[in-house]
Regions:
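A charged N-terminal "starter" segment
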Residues: 1-113, 118-132
Length: 134
């Protein structure tokens, strides 16, 4: 893997051009890291947590690579759905799921859910009766 480093001068030039705050993303490194995980742990299914960084370019790259996604809100579900990601490629993993989120999950066909309490299981069952709870 190639190193990705910015010199102080390069960073200063970027700030002058784009202002702050500034986020510099290496899509090449995202792809390399994704492929390394898949190569060395072949049974692994990658679920990228949108909350980590929802930059459109990152999501587009991961969609192209075939990634799955960890969603935590109705907004994240809608975002991925608009980008063409099916519910089969998502897991709803929020310790306290909203009713809006569960309804949206049911609409797009999300079947996999995590839970942290018995109350969450009851809520999931009510709004997504055919859910798979992990």
């Amino acid at each position: 893997m190639k190193s990705f480093k910015l010199t102080k001068e390069e960073a200063t030039m970027l700030v002058q051009k784009y202002a702050t705050p500034l986020e510099v993303i290496s899509l090449e490194h995202i792809e390399e890291n994704y492929n390394l995980l898949c190569k060395h742990i072949p049974r692994l299914k990658v679920f990228y947590a949108i909350k980590a960084n929802s930059a459109k370019c990152i999501l587009e790259k991961l969609i192209k690579l075939g990634s799955n996604f960890d969603v935590a809100s109705a907004g994240e579900i809608r975002l991925l759905s608009k980008m063409g990601v099916s519910g089969e490629k998502m897991i709803y993993a929020n310790p306290v799921k909203t009713i809006e989120g569960l309804i949206e999950a049911s609409k797009v066909g999300i079947k996999r859910f995590t839970f942290d309490s018995e109350n969450e299981i009851d809520k999931i069952k009510k709004y997504v009766p055919d859910a798979e709870v992990l």
